[in-house]
């Protein structure tokens, strides 16, 4: 994945089979996530200085800058998403978190084949797509929201789908899929392009379906307004259960300076389906219901 000698320890760990996440807490501790289980591994770094230099190089490959004046950085590379935090006044060690992007599209039939979903759920999910009604996929971090969203969107290659993400994860293979990616401000505080800005632009791009990788802020309200005006929309949202989706929507509305009950009513009228994904042991569990 990386050919630079400074990044060899990271490349070695990422090359291991089944690794979906890799984290470092300082130079001496590393852990990998395989099949939803964490295990400690040898880091391969010999000093904090060596590790910090590797982190700076990795972030720079992603077109970002990290230093003591700006000790935090996120970067999106071809196959991984990186978040780094240099040792500074707020933390004693340099930290690195790497999420590996899925290397292939997972079809709903594959989820069914490995007993992740039932035949009835597969049929209902296809009904959600065929209805061209808007939906939200909820779940906690690492539950598989993006994986399920990718599987859903891959079911219909004839749609013109516009995806909007802060880091590229969906990576749909359809030729008529447009991928828009938000951009953080540079070290001078300039050049930021938000999810909400991209969403507004996407409304003018003749989409059959608009999808936001994850809604966290103002883009949720804009997406609900677009859906209520007839656009077919989809997104993921962090929530611990399907019952907590409404509270999460109200929380985002409040943080975005909107009246929460008003936005909750808008969500009720514009989002037709709620899909919740969770992990129980080694299996994913789905709950699909009408938003009534």
Where are these regions (language model features)?
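Conserved lysine of the Walker
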Residues: 145
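Phosphate-interacting basic helix/loop segments used at nucleotide- and nucleic-acid interfaces
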Residues: 1-21, 62-69
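Hydrophobic anchor at the beta1->P-loop junction of P-loop NTPases
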Residues: 137-139
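Conserved P-loop NTPase
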Residues: 268-292
